[in-house]
């Protein structure tokens, strides 16, 4: 299968205006396209900083986390004009942010941040950004990449299992929706 994939980094999804530019770019493309987005600009660093603060027993991690929450809600406010849709997206994003808040609380309570927990925390940036952007672009369908990108552990780190991942990608995107 031939798939057109467009990757937008953090700067491309760092503000209301930049997300609206991504919308224009993607919607102007005639053929089906897969859109991959990073976390909102600066969020990955903020997620890691908050995790570090929680690990070190610094209760100010809660303030950092509340800034992460506010940033996402502000972006949603700016990119989704329809009130009903905006409220629904806010609910979905808040559900993810509540999960993330619980993870931070656990890290704070046990003063420990494993590599797996750190990776999980960072993943929320992309997951939330994807949720927002998929609700901004017309005809977009959200896919959770955790369902088709698989890894295997090798020497204490995870590497992509390309054989399984490629098969799952083909199964997931056949037929390919207009925007995913």
Where are these regions (language model features)?
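Nucleotide/pyrophosphate-binding catalytic subdomain
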Residues: 1-180
